[in-house]
Amino acid sequence: MEIVHVCIQALSHYIFSTTEKNIRNEVVLITGSGRGLGQQMAILFAKRGAIVVLCDSPDIGNSETLELISSINNEKRVHAYTCDIGNRVEVKLLVERIQTEVGNITMLVNNATVLTSNSILDMSEDEFSRSLNANLFSAYWLIRQILPSMMRRNHGHIITMLGSTAVFGLGNFSAVCTAKSGLVGLMESIDHELTLGGYDGIYTTAAVSHYLTTHLFQLSKTCFNPVIPPLTLDYAAKKIMHAILINRKFVCVPRLYYLIPFVKGILPARAFLIILNTLVNPKIPIYTQHELSSKHNLTSSTQHIPRKRSHMSACQ
């Protein structure tokens, strides 16, 4: 009966809850804020009176976002930092500096993404490791640094941005798919730990979105078929922001993505692949075992695997 009661309560909250919480004076750290979705989210947070802390890689920077927010908000309420989030030491120093110069971070938005597009056999182990550091371990490092101050006050919100690669794997995107699906498990685990610990004032939100009209889409659009057009940044950001403000644990934009786990569960694997190939370009090389052995000399003790060019960026 308790399960039924909780389900009814959750359904009622999902349908009827429209009261958005006040985030004025919350200190919000947003990674990958230099452009794309991170920039759009930063603007929305600033419009609601939050103290916005921008963070992006040195090669991208935050000058454009800083200028946009400064025209909305007082300059003293926006702070900009650069950091290689794939570097554990830099992440640690970043958080310590923010806590000293700005204050305790009460909202964390894990948005930064490094997109690497390579076949699993054409990607070096170092490339795969760097992708995991930037896309998965960066969120882990940030949460480990920031969560203790949230727990002391029983107040905070951890948000993680996920793309479509969090709900289904795509050929030639093994590194980012591994990282993003790992983030789903990380967020669910953290939420469970907070519940077990009685921290009812700390919330988590995982946001899955369809691909967006950003520079990453321009880099990777040859991989996708235009069955479902990309979402605009403004639309996606507003939907995700609303979910954050009503403390929703999981949000999909568009809602069609809620059906993907269900469809994967009931359809034969080959049937789901047919659906997947209507969304993405199915021209992924498929080799027989003999062809693989010949192409990559897998029986040899030393392998030389040719590397393709990869597209990398620091924000969505």
Give each language-model segment a name.
Residues 119-120, 127-129:
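Substrate-binding pocket helix/loop in short-chain dehydrogenase/reductase
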Residues 193-257:
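SDR active-site lid
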Residues 143, 179:
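Active-site helix of classical SDR
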Residues 13-53:
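Canonical Rossmann dinucleotide-binding motif of NAD(H)/NADP(H)-dependent dehydrogenases/reductases
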Residues 48-64:
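Conserved glycine-rich Rossmann-like NAD(P)H-binding loop of the short-chain dehydrogenase/reductase
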Residues 1-25, 274-316:
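Non-catalytic terminal and boundary segments that flank Rossmann-like NAD(P)-dependent oxidoreductase
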Residues 59-60, 81-93, 125:
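The beta1-alpha1 cofactor-binding region of Rossmann-like NAD(H)/NADP(H)-dependent oxidoreductases
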